[in-house]
Amino acid sequence: LLLGRLSLHQADGAILLATELHAQWLEPYAQRHPIVQSSEFDPDVDIVHVSVDSYQAARDVMNHLLSLGHKRIALISSENRYYSTAMRLKGYLDALADAGLPATPEYIRKATVDYTFKSGFNSARSLLSQEARPTALFCISDMLALGAIAGAQEMGFRVPEDVTVVGFDDVEHTTMFHPYVTTVAQPCFDIGRRAMELLYELMNGRETPRQVVLPHSLMVRESSAARHCGFMDFPVCV
């Protein structure tokens, strides 16, 4: 383990970028050494972390889709064990419940743990092959969204005229090709900088907040549009 370098005094502290749930094994390290969780974190371990509010971000995406008139909204999630993934799923489900819409198991797909383009592509094709197909796809990462757009287009669907696609992260690729992707922007640079600031404070024996939540932004672009009845909508134009 790289964390073993702390015990060997080969490092003075650590920033963790991919902490999964059930990470209690980290606590003994954090009790002896300065450690900060950055972006991904386990809320059940007492280790400083900095992130965005993935639950609220998912609610913001869903509110956007609902405001556009979408009712058949699918989620392309992941098989990983990140807290952010769980919170985006919860935000999706809670938004449906608050809108009086059913949570349809057939509208939820779990892509690979590493958010690959191909898994987004395959998930979108699976979702859009249903007779009562969804009219909007909420993808928990931009790479999944880019794959979903490619999958939809290969099937003959137009984005956003026939199906809306929304991502998460705001990576550079979302504005390289049309349609530009509607997505949640995470302040990745600020997250990294704040994590380093927190680590520096811990390394110097100073008190720090246990959690820091930085603001996100919903970037509304070309891949999302109002629900309307088009030539490919016959089974689900309700």
What are these regions (language model features)?
Residues 1-10, 24-25, 30-37, 41-238:
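Bacterial carbohydrate/catabolite-sensing allosteric modules
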Residues 14:
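Intrinsically disordered, low-complexity polar regions and short flexible loop motifs
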Residues 19-23:
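Structural motif corresponding to alpha-helix initiation and N-cap regions
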